[in-house]
Amino acid sequence: ILGRWWRYKWITFHPSLTADSIWRQGDDINLYGSGTPVQQWMTYRDAETYRSIVRKGPLFPLNSLMYHGIVSAENAYYGLEKVQTDSDFADQVWSYFATGTQLQELYITPSMLNKVKWDTLAKAAKWSKENASVLVDTHWIGGDPTALAVYGWASWSKDKAILGLRNPSDKPQAYYLDLAKDFEIPTGDVAQFSLKAVYGSNKTVPVEYKNATVITLQPLETLVFEAVPVN
């Protein structure tokens, strides 16, 4: 792990130095945008990632970032030291694992989690492990969280793809779902999919995706889908 103060010259002038993950930059925890402190924390986390990593180095592998993990702890701050609703916690957990990060951090006080939260965490972590070979391809899709635009993460392999989307606004927003573009599918490969909701439910997302379409995300909605190619 290289922490906050990584420098490109280390890699340039020290070829023996390797790093599995680097810090996404910014504050450990902060708030931005709409909703509860948990929702604002998620927006800040992703806005910082977009500003410091995606825009400056669009080819940098997102699975090699240290995001500062899942936070629900007595020693946290900005409202994250308080018990979260089950739905807020689930949004935080699934959005975190959808980033594909290989450095999976938990900043958690166990007594603040009930059975529902533990089950959510276990399910998402297991899903992440089972799909590691796909999630290694994770890249950014959509817009800028700082502008409260719909954004997310996509990863693709020939046998399976994964799509995560989030609306950071407190208003419904449309998203142009073009999976050939979002998955960055090579020319000639299948671009039609059967979509299975892994987290969340949205009736505007087609179960059988054939062509680009406009979907609508509800305020502060987080979605995760698996996509299986259809010949």
Task: Report each predicted region and the residues it spans.
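Active-site-proximal substrate-binding groove within the catalytic cores of carbohydrate-active enzymes
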Residues: 2-201, 216-224
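C-terminal beta-strand-rich structural cap/linker in extracellular carbohydrate-active enzymes
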Residues: 204-231
